[in-house]
Amino acid sequence: MSTIDNLDAHTPMMQQYLKLKAQHPDILLFYRMGDFYELFYDDAKRASQLLDISLTKRGASAGEPIPMAGIPHHAVENYLAKLVNQGESVAICEQIGDPATTKGPVERKVVRIVTPGTISDEALLQERQDNLLAAIWQDSKGFGYATLDISSGRFRLSEPADRETMAAELQRTNPAELLYAEDFAESSLIEGRRGLRRRPLWEFEIDTARQQLNLQFGTRDLVGFGVENAPRGLCAAGCLLQYVKDTQRTSLPHIRSITMERQQDSIIMDAATRRNLEITQNLAGGTDNTLASVLDCTVTPMGSRMLKRWLHMPVRDTAVLVERQQTIGALQERYTELQPVLRQVGDLERILARLALRTARPRDLARMRHALQQLPLLRELLADVDSQPVQKLREKMGEFTELRELLERAVIDAPPVLVRDGGVIAPGYSEELDEWRALADGATDYLDKLEIRERERLGLDTLKVGYNAVHGYYIQISRGQSHLAPIHYVRRQTLKNAERYIIPELKEYEDKVLTSKGKALALEKQLYDELFDLLLPHLADLQTSASALAELDVLVNLAERAETLNYCCPTFSDKPGIRISEGRHPVVEQVLKEPFIANPLQLAPQRRMLIITGPNMGGKSTYMRQTALIALLAYIGSYVPAQKVEIGPIDRIFTRVGAADDLASGRSTFMVEMTETANILHNATEHSLVLMDEIGRGTSTYDGLSLAWACAENLANKIKALTLFATHYFELTQLPEKMEGVANVHLDALEHGDTIAFMHSVQDGAASKSYGLAVAALAGVPKEVIKRARQKLRELESISPNAAATQVDGTQMSLLAAPEETSPAVEALENLDPDSLTPRQALEWIYRLKSLV
């Protein structure tokens, strides 16, 4: 790329470009030139690859051809969306001077910087998903983490204590852009993440952070926000706020507070648990067949985003949960009336953010007006609902009659996309604007009258009056009649078959019309800006209303889901345990064509661990996951897929279900499995719900069985967590005999020949066999292989008859059965050479063996 070392060698325009580019060296610069945004040098080469646009050359500057690429200004949003999705940031440089009055290059400046984490434009955002900017900080005591959704003003910070908790937060929030200090130590935590931005250390200084935050919120200290004693979180928040101010280059009135997220307030789920439970993303990275795909029938984008936040942060405050349950119950008979009205509210939350940033477009204001028009009907529908929480939401929604009437007066019904196109402000709102418009709009009548008058006066039937953007107004006469044009007709343009003229009267009117159009557009822009000034003082109340409407949408949605899917209202208990009657998996039951087999579950202080056995594909993993999902739904305040549920305190949910090689980090399947297991054993408590599936299968049989046994023992005896432990190691079914609080359950199956029928029904006691060969046959393994496997199984079973006898039907071997001691008689016989014995010695050996037996 050309540098600014020798600016004099460049043209004035390129000098201007290079100075601006030097201020933004690491991001693309969109440089406005007329109707295009141009990119030069390395930016042009990079953009041509990222956007698949042509790379050309523009003359020369400093003796070298200039690589150039460009995009039309009217299509800029589409190109920005592509770049943002690839993690790129773009500085938008606009012409702010008037080309008509400027000598040399038109004055330009960067008016905004578009980054993946700070976008607010509707075209760039996914409407049903939060778009977060985050900052991470680390010192010897732990991590600081802050997130901001600039499209709503939601500002959060936390202080994860360790690497695992920090990893879980990164997965939960999934930021579009992540700021980190240049000396950040745990680089493996953030490697491969999108939108990484390295920031200087001074941006994370605690004193600077406090000053920035107090300035933003208009406060003297941060005590009122409950974050005063969170120095690591504040360091991250300070850097984040500085970055937003640098990129947005405007005030941020919608960012009014900051909230501390504390671990003790919510059920903690690590990264593996969130992945395995497929809450909002399935294991393949998509959104099909996830919990959210079943539960999310919200009718507003902001409601959908709130529901997903609830799913990822289940709360432990039962007062909040009971209030949500009561609201859902009260709304179950009203959702058919409420949802069509709520649907009309749209994404008020993000419209308000654009209003705060002063980037709201005319159609945003029209949508805002439409949202406010729904409030009277919503308030009327909720007025007689006998529920205090519902009435609280109704009050928070507000009415905003004056603002609604203002927008009804000010903005036309279907405004254009951009205010610069004109025609946004409604007739009657401004008398002066109406006068300028009347003058401009009167041109059509005048031109029609002029055309008729001149045609009749001159007797020229080909005479027409018209207008184009290049030559302005003109009188056109065909080539055949052009010799009849009067002398005061001044030729303006010659065409193949016609001549175009101007007359003093038409020129005078043209100047008048163009002046009136310009005046009307300028006044309209001024009135539009004044609308912002009238709306922004009400921003805080409008944001409260948007939040209440989003929450109402979530709760109405949960009421509809509960009714439609036959969910029950769970009850909370102070005693540890989970009791589920006829529980179902919320996702699997929607996918299955046949009826889902519901199953019970009971975990209590005297029954803290269930050893779950049964065939592959028998439903063990489904049974375990449905328990976790029922608990998760209960702790967001939702109804749950069961006949009856009683649930005690839960502080964490852990899952160790399935694994795959982590090739990027050089970790095998077994290493991944053991890392997740170690995390559980270190962090689980007696109030944790733990799902352990097939521990130890990634190593040798004896190693795996020993590890599984020891893990189960530790969870049951030492940690005393509520545990579902699925295994194919039949030896673990002996655990209930050796320790208290452990019970066996199994999933039933019926085998007939080489076929197997899975009953998916949970029964007390251990499974009689694993049905592994039957499942292999079902999977299509060749018959000769199955036949050979059966032969080998019989051989293995015959080797250990004692172990086989301990099983119900002798089809499983006990690997931990004590090895038989070799008999002294056998040892003596092994050392005997019968061919060397005399008859007398042989007789003596018989008596000796008799004594050894």
Curated annotation (Swiss-Prot):
Binding site for ATP: G614, P615, N616, M617, G618, G619, K620, S621
GO molecular function: ATP binding; ATP-dependent DNA damage sensor activity; damaged DNA binding; mismatched DNA binding
SMART domains tied to this protein: MUTSac (SM00534), MUTSd (SM00533)
Species lineage: Bacteria, Pseudomonadati, Pseudomonadota, Gammaproteobacteria, Enterobacterales
Name of the protein: DNA mismatch repair protein MutS
Keywords attached to this entry: ATP-binding, DNA damage, DNA repair, DNA-binding, Nucleotide-binding
Family: Belongs to the DNA mismatch repair MutS family.
Top-level taxonomic group: Bacteria
GO biological process: mismatch repair
Organism per entry: Klebsiella pneumoniae subsp. pneumoniae (strain ATCC 700721 / MGH 78578)
GO CC annotations on file: cytosol
Alphabetical list of CDD domains matching this protein: ABC_MutS1 (cd03284)
Reported function: This protein is involved in the repair of mismatches in DNA. It is possible that it carries out the mismatch recognition step. This protein has a weak ATPase activity.
